[in-house]
Amino acid sequence: MTMTDPIADMLTRLRNANSAYHDSVTMPASKIKSHIAEILQQEGFITGWKTEDAEVGKNLTLELKFGPNRERSIAGIKRISKPGLRVYAKSTNLPKVLGGLGVAIISTSHGLLTDKQAGKKGVGGEVLAYVW
């Protein structure tokens, strides 16, 4: 069975593992998922990620980050642009997540960027997800 929205699947797996206090979560790998994982690591939502060769395909493993008393570093994740309803933002109208406390992941002509990086470069694009 083919997957309609692999990004939504990644975010759902991450949200469920975070809610269950798992230390890591594994999913099928792709380039865009690796770029999203890189942004999540840069912004401090996960401790690390790696791709592994499996018997069939590749797997992406994300290491979740928790505070000293097992507080979650990810309070919420929301998929914004979906296959049935794409959402785009101009460089002058980039979204702010929780007044700048969260991160919007945006697919631009310069690759995947956060809302802050896209604002500095002056580019807009497709708003993939919000993470806070």
UniProtKB/Swiss-Prot annotation:
Pfam families: Ribosomal_S8. GO terms for molecular function: rRNA binding; structural constituent of ribosome. Gene3D superfamilies: 3.30.1370.30, 3.30.1490.10. Keywords: Ribonucleoprotein, Ribosomal protein, RNA-binding, rRNA-binding. InterPro entries: Ribosomal_uS8, Ribosomal_uS8_sf. It comes from the Bacteria. One of its GO terms (biological process) is translation. The keyword RNA-binding applies. One of its GO terms (cellular component) is cytosolic small ribosomal subunit. One of the primary rRNA binding proteins, it binds directly to 16S rRNA central domain where it helps coordinate assembly of the platform of the 30S subunit. Belongs to the universal ribosomal protein uS8 family. Part of the 30S ribosomal subunit. Contacts proteins S5 and S12. HAMAP family: Ribosomal_uS8_B. This is Small ribosomal subunit protein uS8.
